[in-house]
Curated annotation (Swiss-Prot):
CDD domains named in the record: HMA (cd00371)
Keywords in alphabetical order: Metal-binding
Residues that coordinate or bind a metal cation: 13, 16
Name of the featured protein: Uncharacterized protein HI_0292
Gene Ontology molecular function: any one: metal ion binding
Pfam families: HMA
Amino acid sequence: MKTITLNIKGIHCGCCVKSLTQVLTELDGVQSADVQLEGKANITFDENRVNVAQLIEVIEDAGFDATE
């Protein structure tokens, strides 16, 4: 397992946090996602099942901007 912190733009409220947490944790290979209102997400994932580019893509598909 690997843990990464991503910077996320576009998180404005608790609903954004909940929505993004749900999208990430539903992704195959993600063990946990701690999304913070301050624009950070700590994600623990299995590198053999998902990669950072896929995490960023899912976040962007949900309407947010993400960078490492």
